[in-house]
């Protein structure tokens, strides 16, 4: 049998990624956006440690034909485990898995029997995939197994994964077989909430809570800085028409905490993970640009010149007890936050106890770096044209900067009030550090304070 060169060449062309851009040209725009983000990460150094892997993940997922990431495996907001072994996509809507179950695009198991275009049929094994199995034979097998058929609209038969009527008209064709790619497996770390928790462990291992222990009332500044979260939630829900879950995920951008934003969005609105992650980390990188105008607008020259007294250092015992007590209180009062806060405090305890130096270094360096790579590249992979190039994305980006600005304003305004109540002993500039962008926000407070008064040293107070 000779080789048809024309058909072979045409097959090469039609299976190439370049050809697939003809049917999905918007993916080219996503490739361009990924390149812009790579430029910002490398040249402008905007949060490069995470923005670079996010951008590269976005690039990989939009190089069509690579099959490195499949949104279908995570449809409905959770991992569809039955599909990871390979599944057939029928009519773009329903999935038949390899063990005879049927789930819809939302990942719900509809029945323990196969469902084909509204027909409930029993799982059928075809020894010869080219043979035809009349629908009547399927019904006979149903009866033999003691099952009752339902919603039988017309006679049909199966042939090699395609569904035909009794007259031979095709009802639906079997689509691609879903075989999980590399990023599908790595994305499970996001889906299951593993990566954000491990990053918090690394953050805790490098954080000094001594200033907070020495001056507990500054905890209120962190609470006030969450104003942006709540106000953005209201705007997103009431004005822009997002669902309550989506609005909550968008509002968390105001906390200026990337891992928390990813963790919460993965729980509440996973379809918005790409836009929210990019917005959260972009605004974290822009802290030195966004915060100073707000800080100067809400404070007077006199307030910015206030020199705060140096804090009394926290004792070693206090630093060891602190993460243990916080973990217990948070787990009892707010159990849903226990995974994140528990990992944060575990890392901090490893730092402060003084007997696990090797673990502390691993958490801060090797573990943190590896997880950051996996987190970034998989979050970027969710940013496909269908989810990213929408009006909703522009609304998310706009509300994100509002959330960030309002969070900064909330912290500064409460710091002004605390300054009044303390008789002028608190510099309101430290209020902007109530957002979770550590240590960037604290550095901004330090810089603005020294601009007003070179003798000012606000860094530890802001931390």
Annotate each language-model stretch with its function.
Residues 279-355:
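Membrane-embedded hairpin module used as a gating/binding unit in multi-pass transport
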Residues 211-233, 386-411, 462-463:
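Entry/N-cap segments of selected transmembrane alpha helices
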Residues 19-30, 184-199, 244-252, 281, ...:
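Structural signature of hydrophobic alpha-helical transmembrane segments
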Residues 37, 187-213, 348-350, 368-390:
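Hydrophobic transmembrane alpha-helices of secondary-active transporters
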Residues 192, 200-206, 223-231, 243-271, ...:
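Alpha-helical membrane segments and immediately flanking helix-loop junctions
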Residues 1-13, 71-181:
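Low-complexity, proline/glycine-enriched hydrophobic segments characteristic of transmembrane helices
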Residues 327-411:
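Transmembrane helical segments that form the transport core of multi-pass membrane transport proteins
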């Amino acid at each position: 049998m000779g080789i048809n060169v024309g058909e072979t060449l045409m097959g090469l062309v039609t299976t190439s990624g370049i050809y697939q851009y003809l049917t999905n040209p918007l993916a080219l725009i996503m490739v361009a956006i990924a390149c812009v983000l790579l430029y910002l990460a490398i040249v402008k150094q905007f949060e490069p440690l995470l923005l670079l892997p996010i951008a590269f993940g976005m690039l990989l997922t939009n190089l069509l034909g690579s099959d490195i990431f499949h949104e279908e495996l995570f449809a409905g907001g959770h991992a569809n485990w039955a599909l990871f072994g390979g599944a057939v996509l029928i009519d773009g809507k329903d999935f038949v898995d390899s063990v005879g179950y049927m789930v819809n695009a939302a990942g719900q198991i509809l029945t323990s029997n196969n469902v084909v275009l509204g027909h409930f049929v029993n799982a059928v094994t075809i020894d010869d995939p080219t043979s035809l199995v009349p629908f009547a034979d399927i019904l006979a097998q149903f009866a033999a197994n003691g099952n009752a058929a339902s919603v039988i609209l017309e006679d049909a038969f199966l042939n090699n994964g395609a569904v035909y009527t009794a007259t031979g008209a095709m009802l639906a064709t079997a689509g691609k077989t879903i075989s999980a790619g590399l990023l599908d497996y790595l994305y499970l770390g996001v889906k299951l909430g593993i990566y954000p928790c491990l990053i918090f462990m690394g953050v805790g291992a490098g954080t000094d809570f001594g200033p907070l222990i020495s001056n507990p009332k500054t905890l209120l500044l962190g609470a006030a800085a969450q104003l942006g979260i709540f106000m953005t939630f209201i705007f997103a829900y009431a004005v822009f028409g997002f669902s309550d879950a989506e609005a909550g995920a968008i509002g968390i951008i105001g906390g200026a905490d990337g891992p928390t934003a990813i963790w919460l969005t993965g729980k509440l609105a996973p379809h918005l993970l790409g836009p929210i992650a990019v917005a959260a980390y972009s605004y974290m990188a822009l802290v030195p640009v966004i915060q100073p105008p707000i800080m100067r607008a809400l404070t007077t020259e006199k307030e910015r010149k206030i020199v705060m007294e140096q804090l009394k250092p926290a004792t070693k015992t206090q630093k060891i007890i602190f993460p243990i007590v916080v973990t217990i209180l948070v787990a009892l009062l707010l159990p849903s936050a226990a995974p994140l806060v528990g990992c944060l405090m575990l890392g901090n305890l490893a730092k402060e106890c003084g007997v696990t130096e090797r673990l502390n270094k691993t958490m801060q360096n090797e573990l943190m770096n590896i997880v950051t790579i996996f987190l970034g590249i998989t979050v970027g992979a969710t940013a496909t044209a269908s989810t990213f190039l929408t009006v909703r994305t522009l609304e998310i980006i706009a509300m994100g900067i509002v959330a960030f600005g309002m969070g900064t304003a909330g912290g500064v305004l409460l710091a002004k009030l605390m300054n009044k109540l303390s008789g002028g002993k608190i510099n309101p500039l430290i209020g902007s550090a109530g957002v979770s962008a550590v240590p960037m926000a604290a550095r901004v407070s330090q810089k603005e304070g020294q601009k007003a008064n070179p003798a000012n040293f606000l860094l530890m107070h802001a931390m």
